[in-house]
Amino acid sequence: MRIESGRMLNDYIQPNKKQYCIPVFQRDYAWTSEQCEKLFEDIVLAFKKDREHFCGSFVYAPLPTRKQIDRYIIIDGQQRFTTLYILIKALADSATDESDKAELEKYLYNEDKFNRYGLDDKSKLKLKPVKTDNDQLQLLMAGKLDKMNKGKDGIIYHNYMLFRELIATFLAEDHDDSIMMIRDGMDSLICADIRLD
């Protein structure tokens, strides 16, 4: 076991050729709108005050893999990780500048430009939740919002739409380059990095 300090965005989500899997024994994605709003406020505050914000622990372990990407199982921190992933998708979809959009999408997908790694569409995503959530996440990433669960169990859809609203409100405050300001605030999120080998 190794314990260090890690940055949620740059150490886990950004690197290419990594995929984080949420095991079946973990509960389905369940973050409430209040938790999402609090996380968004913390991210904005971290950017404005230019300081790090501790957001808990991230416990993970390597998985055997047949493809040339490193795969990990998330043992603790899956709710926060999934929420950040949804927020990045909302940021990318809110970006009006194509270079900002492309940069944000690098956080969502493993690049395989020349099909060297043999990644299928599901392996290209850097997050693989439990089956029920995975189906909804696949629809979100494909931009098929009309096919997503919008009922009370449609938490991924509802939190994505909430983040779109929060981002729109933030943009309306006339911030220059504000999409990337939110990304920079996300980079200030640190956690206790606990890797089990």
What is each model feature region?
Residues 1-197:
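Glycine- and hydrophobic-rich flexible loops that cap the catalytic core of alpha/beta enzyme folds
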